[in-house]
Structures are given as structure tokens and as C-alpha cells.
């Protein structure tokens, strides 16, 4: 998020709720954390272009199918006139719609809670704060369902 730290999250594709949070230093690539973001029940995982090649890693789970986004430059190079390229572009739009669910908790933390920048207090302390913030974002996202169940 800020000062060379990244928050990697695993979220449910249907509900958008965060189930896994990993805090790493800024120089750790996304693909390194990819398989640790899975909770074990997934058969399909969707990631952005930073996760390309994840299925080839030694820690990759064999029973998980990864759908990883195309690099932006390759997507721009697709020709809309060719039927095959148009189908590939449509598939990329579907993947982007699923990935948007993962980005929504970041929006809740930054816009609704105001945590755009964080003071770096150490990896463990900042990761603990991220875990708390994502738990609160989960509560915020299911607030209407919880209130409806109340009465």
C-alpha cells in the first residue's frame, strides 16, 4: 500500500468477502504469494496479469485451474475485426468482472475508512492492521444482510 509494502488478498468470487490477507514487502512479486492466498476449497482461481505463470510454480496446487488476465499491451494489440480476437477480448472482460470483486475491499478501506496511506511500523504490525481493516470491510459489505436478518 505505502512505503514499500503490499497487501495480497484472497477473496470469494461470489460474495467478494476477503478470506486471506498476506502482507509482504514491496519487492515480493504477486505470483510468489498466489498459491498461499487460496483457502483450499477452490477449484478455479482468477488473477490479474501479475499472476502469469503461477500454474508452473513448484508450490502450485494441481487441482486448481488458474484464469490469469492477459497483459494490457497484448490485449490492446487484439484486432476487433477477427472473430477469434473478439472472443478472447470477451473472455478478458469476464475475467475482469470477477477480479473487480477482489478490488472492492480495497475501495472500502481507502474510501470509506480513509486508509489511503499507512505509516510503516513494521511488517507484522502493518499486516495486523490490514487484517483488521479487511475484517471490518467484510462486515461493512454484509451489513445490510446482517441487519435484515436481525428483524
Regions found by a protein language model. Give the residues of each.
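Helix-centered, glycine/charged polyanion-binding patches within enzymatic domains
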Residues: 43-44, 49-128
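A short, flexible helix-boundary coil/loop motif
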Residues: 144-151
Amino acid at each position: 500500500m505505502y512505503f514499500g509494502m503490499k497487501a495480497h488478498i484472497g477473496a470469494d468470487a461470489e460474495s467478494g468477502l476477503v478470506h486471506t490477507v498476506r502482507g509482504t514487502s514491496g519487492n515480493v512479486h504477486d505470483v510468489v504469494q498466489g498459491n498461499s492466498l487460496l483457502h483450499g476449497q477452490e477449484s478455479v482461481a482468477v488473477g490479474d496479469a501479475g499472476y502469469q505463470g503461477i500454474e508452473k510454480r513448484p508450490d502450485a496446487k494441481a487441482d486448481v485451474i488458474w484464469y490469469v488476465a492477459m497483459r494490457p499491451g497484448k490485449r490492446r494489440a487484439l484486432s476487433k475485426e477477427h472473430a477469434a480476437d473478439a472472443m478472447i477480448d470477451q473472455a478478458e472482460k469476464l475475467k475482469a468482472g470477477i477480479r473487480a470483486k477482489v478490488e472492492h475491499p480495497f475501495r472500502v478501506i481507502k474510501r470509506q475508512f480513509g486508509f489511503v496511506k499507512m505509516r510503516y511500523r513494521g511488517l507484522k504490525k502493518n499486516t495486523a492492521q490490514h487484517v483488521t481493516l479487511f475484517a471490518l470491510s467484510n462486515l461493512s459489505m454484509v451489513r445490510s444482510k446482517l441487519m435484515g436478518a436481525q428483524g
